């Protein structure tokens, strides 16, 4: 029940190195693996699972490995039994019941006489009770497919279980069933996730940071506390190093000025004393050499202080929080920005909402969380609110002003435009200086503002999109967000939270991320389920 990676290196076919000489081990228990997007978390899981070959080094897993990737390799025509890997055993059991007692049948069955009962128990545990084993995947929701994939891995009883973002497509109920299932897993569990509720159920956190794996005992909250404390120390060290550098520079300048004054006075004294030129020259050389030695001492002190500052700055993480002021997004408390009554719509021949429709009114700077099971119609309702989809029945009224949408795909910006060009297109009346200042608030500085959108990392794309949405002309009075944290790393989630907390308009957010919803000050909870839209007191 362990994973041992020794001197592991991996490079892509174009020779771009992802990590080098990585060594670590993970034993029994639950380990959460965290890192910024692009650091190589998913690739590391694929290396451990044997799907990728390392450029150098070795991976040794003690026991059978179960692996649930982020993108599941299932086709729509597969049956539930095929995904669970039990179809051959079920066929053999059926053949035995029909009188076939061949060695091949008994070999196929092996010890799995109770495979159907165990399979159904595992499916029931993950909320898939009543799911027929011959049902095709094409008829299941994305969340059901993920839960089925996890059931398949747990059914194998692996010694090592690798999960890559297992909660991404799960609604709240399915997430909690997954949490419970993993709580009872007794092998070596390694999970890549940005789900902070799941990470808080881990025994330890492994962080892939600057090409190394660093382990932190305890759950994600304990890890965050440790990192925050270290960052506070690093910030203090930077301040001290900056002050020391200023002191050393000042002292060097003062020493140079004193030496210059002494040299000037000495020259005057030598002239007044009428000393021979050879004596006067020696005195001058001695004074210059003494000044040079003193200057070298001060220069070394300045270099040492600069080195200490560089070291202190390297210890500071680039996990900066966005700090914004968004006065133009203010919506008066009494202003109704959207009203919908008797809304009804059908998708795929199925009515999403109750026969009498649903109603929704958004007033003032409300912060609304829209929850409910997958497939209930939450994303469809957002599209009705922003006008990209018209209801089949019912009435809609939108106040004058702009409604902006932010999807989990972050596909709002033109791929060939630079960050600076994107903001200029969104806010053409802003001066160049003002745009540069705003982009700096979103952590875009120097050459980064001239990068095309297509070349941005996931976190950079989020920040660029937020800048263009929040500072667009006119500023949005209503913001719609559909599972905005799904493809973000933990740093980017924190930056999104900061931006939304600065936003002063109304927003409606669809999310199953409980910690995210807690952090953005939701003041109204709505649940869409079985065609009914109802007020609730919390995420459940």
Give residue ranges: language-model regions.
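Conserved catalytic segment of ABC-fold P-loop ATPases
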Residues: 200-207, 519-527
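Coupling and communication elements adjacent to P-loop NTPase active sites across diverse families
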Residues: 1-11, 89-146, 229-347
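ABC-family P-loop ATPase nucleotide-binding domains
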Residues: 74-139, 411-478, 483
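Conserved catalytic motifs of ABC-family nucleotide-binding domains
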Residues: 157
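ABC ATPase nucleotide-binding domain signature region
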Residues: 30-31, 43-104, 364-376, 380-432, ...
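Conserved beta-strand
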Residues: 5-8, 17-29, 57, 340-346, ...
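Catalytic Walker B motif of ABC-type/P-loop ATPase nucleotide-binding domains
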Residues: 161-165, 170, 406, 478-483, ...
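Hydrophobic anchor residue at the start of the ABC signature
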Residues: 150, 178, 466, 485
């Amino acid at each position: 029940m362990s994973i041992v990676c020794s001197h592991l290196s991996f490079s892509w076919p174009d020779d771009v190195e992802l990590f080098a000489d990585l060594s670590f081990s993970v034993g029994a228990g639950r380990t959460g693996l965290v890192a910024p997007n692009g650091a190589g978390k998913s690739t590391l899981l694929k290396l451990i699972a044997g799907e990728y070959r390392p450029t150098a080094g070795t991976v040794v897993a003690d026991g059978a490995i179960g692996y649930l990737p982020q993108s599941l390799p299932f086709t729509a025509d597969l049956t539930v039994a095929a995904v669970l890997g039990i179809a051959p055993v079920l066929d053999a059991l059926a053949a035995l019941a029909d009188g076939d007692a061949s060695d091949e049948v008994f070999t196929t069955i092996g010890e799995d006489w109770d495979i159907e009962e165990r399979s159904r128990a595992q499916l029931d545990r993950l909320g898939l009770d009543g799911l027929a084993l011959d049902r095709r995947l094409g008829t299941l929701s994305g969340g059901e497919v993920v839960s089925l994939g996890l059931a398949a891995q747990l059914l194998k009883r692996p010694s090592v279980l690798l999960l890559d973002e297992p909660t991404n497509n799960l609604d709240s109920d399915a997430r909690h069933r997954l949490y419970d299932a993993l709580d009872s897993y007794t092998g070596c569990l390694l999970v890549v996730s940005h789900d902070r509720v799941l990470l808080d159920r881990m025994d330890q956190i492994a962080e892939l940071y600057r090409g190394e794996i660093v382990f932190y005992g305890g759950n994600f909250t304990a890890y965050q506390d440790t990192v925050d404390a270290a960052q506070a120390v690093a910030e203090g060290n930077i301040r001290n190093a900056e002050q020391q550098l200023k002191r050393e520079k000042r002292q060097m300048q003062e020493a140079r000025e004193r030496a210059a004054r002494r040299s000037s006075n000495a020259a005057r004294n030598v002239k007044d004393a009428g000393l021979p030129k050879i004596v006067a020259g020696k005195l001058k050389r001695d004074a210059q050499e003494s000044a040079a030695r003193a200057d070298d001492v001060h220069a070394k002190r300045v270099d040492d202080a600069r080195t200490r500052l560089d070291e202190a700055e390297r210890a500071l993480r680039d996990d900066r929080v966005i700090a914004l002021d968004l006065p133009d997004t203010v919506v008066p408390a009494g202003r109704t920005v959207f009203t919908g009554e008797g809304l009804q719509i059908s998708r795929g021949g199925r009515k999403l909402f109750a026969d009498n429709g649903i109603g929704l009114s958004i007033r003032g700077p409300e912060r609304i969380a829209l929850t409910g099971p997958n497939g209930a119609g939450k994303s469809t309702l957002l599209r009705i609110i922003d006008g990209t989809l018209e209801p089949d029945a019912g009435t809609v009224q939108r106040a004058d002003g702009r409604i902006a949408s932010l999807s989990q795909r972050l596909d709002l910006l033109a791929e060939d435009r630079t960050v600076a060009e994107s903001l200029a297109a969104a806010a053409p009346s802003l001066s160049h200086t003002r745009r540069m200042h705003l982009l700096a608030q979103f952590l875009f500085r120097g050459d980064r503002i001239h990068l095309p959108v297509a070349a941005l990392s996931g976190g950079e794309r989020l920040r660029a999109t937020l800048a263009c949405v929040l500072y667009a002309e006119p500023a949005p009075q209503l913001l719609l967000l559909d599972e905005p944290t799904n493809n973000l790393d933990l740093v980017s989630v924190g930056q999104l939270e900061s931006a939304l907390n600065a936003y002063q308009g109304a927003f409606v957010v669809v999310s199953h991320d409980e910690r995210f919803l807690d952090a953005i000050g939701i003041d109204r909870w709505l649940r869409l389920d079985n065609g009914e839209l109802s007020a609730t007191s919390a995420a459940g």
